[in-house]
């Protein structure tokens, strides 16, 4: 259903996915099965040092309605109900997490050829109200993201962003934390098998800068390698292989050049789907 400029979260997303997606510092395993009625059940386990986290997620789809229920080892139950296009261009999402009775919220998204709007409100007496809006086209868009705390009467956050796409190049500029932090990102397809990207952030309060550059290259249609490095001297690399349709095996590593005497961090992820 997504059309036009999309939602505010799309601003800078290509660069973020290139630089941060799929990098893993832990051991993660997930397997998805489907019942004869089409119900999808995904079991996930993550080993974080001496801590093991797990969850079981169930998804049921019926026409434009989707129900997701996830039970985690922290004794929480997350339920998400999605109604896709109850009216043209509209999506409604209702979510609640137990036992946290303050976590419930409803979100409405609207997609137009020249705009994308999302607004959400929590199910509490004094909720936090979120609003984000983007206007423009697939090539040029401008948006804002605002959260207002009705209890304190203050803005929780106020962000603004700009996105530009032309042919194989995408660039974005985002002002975060009520104007305290500026992020600029760049993403470019340099060949059918290779992309490069970078992200630069500046904090106006602390005067600190952060730079991350990365690349991705497809060795073959089923195998991809990625690498990134930042100005703190931390380098990451991964290799991901799709050994069967929708099933991925990923190995990633991290080395800190300023603490070379310490062992490198290695992460492994295995996702199985029928």
UniProtKB/Swiss-Prot annotation:
Expressed in leaf tips, anthers and stigma. One of its GO terms (cellular component) is chloroplast envelope. It is found in: Cell membrane; Mitochondrion outer membrane. The keyword Hydrolase does not apply. InterPro entries: Porin_dom_sf (IPR023614), Porin_Euk (IPR001925), Porin_Euk/Tom40 (IPR027246). The modification Phosphoserine is found at residue 76. Interacts with KIN14F/KP1. Interacts with FBA6 and GAPC1. Forms a channel through the mitochondrial outer membrane that allows diffusion of small hydrophilic molecules. The channel adopts an open conformation at low or zero membrane potential and a closed conformation at potentials above 30-40 mV. The open state has a weak anion selectivity whereas the closed state is cation-selective. This is Mitochondrial outer membrane protein porin 3. It comes from Arabidopsis thaliana.
